[in-house]
Amino acid sequence: NSLIPLKKGTIEEELSFQQRLRNRIVQALVDSLYQKADIKRYIYPPKQPECVVRDLCVHYRGNLDSSTSFIVASDYNCGRCVQFEKTLSKLYDQYREQVKFGFVHFADAPSLAALACEAADKQGQFWSFHDAIFNYVEVADSAFIYNFAKSKRLDMREFDKNLHSPDNYKKLDNIINRLVERGLMATPTIIINDRLVYVTNSYEELSKLLEREL
């Protein structure tokens, strides 16, 4: 018996057709199950009490009287956090009159940048340090931090004392541990009205979520 050669692409075309057919059948089955079970699809899950973080040291700006909160658990030394800060800045510019925006430190351990922001907060300069560090093109080292503190005309003796305060370190370390206990695992983590946002960090999707909450 002689073998009959198949034309090139015949098997690939058949497999492709079978895959498309399988996908259609599966999608039809899923749609049918959704309709019968009346399942609702969420972009993020219903409220989870364990993800409430407002009792921790959260810094706020925007509309402080708003019932809609947008909290970010973030790390100054995290590349993804630095990138997300650009999106967050756009959201803040768009919704600052309607939303209460919050920030809470979250990392493996308290960083120099985080400690500096908390020390600056003692003199009312948390957000200026926060923005400057995220906008800095390199890792914020002690030289950058002290030079920026001087440029803001802080009391340098007081700033230095608070920067190296054991209580300052313990406070941030405790916050990090509490966040881990509440289920946070990565940075940046977004929390809108006590709900974790798992799926997206895009400006468009986050805008839609905020519009739904307002």
Description of each model-found segment:
Residues 11-14, 43-50, 128-136:
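Short N-terminal helix-initiation segments at or just after the protein's N-terminus
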